[in-house]
Amino acid sequence: MKKWMLAICLMFINEICHATDCFDLAGRDYKIDPDLLRAISWKESRYRVNAIGINPVTGYGSGLMQVDSQHFNELARYGIKPEHLTTDPCMNIYTGAYYLAIAFKKWGVSWEAVGAYNAGFRKTERQNQRRLAYASDVYRIYTGIKSSKGIRIPATKKSLPEINSVQNN
């Protein structure tokens, strides 16, 4: 029984370590701060590889980065199946980084684009509020991650600092 529990614990630890490396790799490949990807993953799934989150508008989100089911048809063209997103942490992290990179390309490297990762691009007051709330949550998580590494990020009360100034700290 103890050996069985140890084996499960080691598999879980291995999966987390593997996923941690994937944040760094995806960040490098998409030129996104890996800690920003980590912050989004914590906000979306609390780092749960097999997380499923219901989205009343589009269906559901899958895995660490909560990749939305609305993208499944597009992802299928690349051989990515929904089950890959809840069983392969690297696939999920890279897919999330891909969609964040699309948001950055569309709206620039900004907290508004981070908000669009979750709330989409529709330009309505409600969506603007959802983007800001999401980006603010991610920013708080992100600064916590940076702080744990001894990196200070300027606090601001009015608005979020420019994302590039934060990433370069």
Curated annotation (Swiss-Prot):
Pfam families named in the record: SLT
The alphabetical list of record keywords is: Plasmid
Keyword Chaperone attached: no
Q: List the disulfide bonds.
A: none
Indicate yes or no for the key word Coiled coil: no
Any transmembrane segments, and where?
none
Protein family membership: Belongs to the IagB/IpgF/P19 family.
- Protein name per its UniProtKB record: X polypeptide
Species of provenance: Escherichia coli (strain K12)
